[in-house]
Amino acid sequence: MDKILIDSDVILDALLDRKPFSVHATQILSMCETGEINGYLTPVIYSNLYYLLRRIAKHEKVIEKLKQLIKITKVLTMDQQVVENALHSGFLDFEDALQNYAAINRSNIDLILTRNLKDYKNSELGIFTPETYIKSRKSKR
């Protein structure tokens, strides 16, 4: 079973029904819910989601969405090593560097799902959009 870090843009696509991306993003969350894949988020992703969703919804509603999300995903830890690796990386976006090294620090993460492929070009992990990941799973069957 694949262990996948899901970037915040993918989660937002699903939660905000951002077409056309929401189709595949919703499939990814469904796969997490059914146990087909293990989806992981970081505390930074939860913080970003709260901040962005709070702009359009009340605190209680946002917290409820995040509670639903945490039921179907797991949280990667971030520690000093993750921050130091991110600080010394070649990533131009520090937040993406944090996500990347949180996934690498947890050695069994297989890949990162994001729509911002260019932001992760320096990653050692496989980087996929939700669409290409779903297509690659279908071709393996």
Which role does the model predict for each range below?
Residues 1-40, 54-61, 134-141:
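Short, well-structured N-terminal submotif of metal-dependent ribonuclease cores
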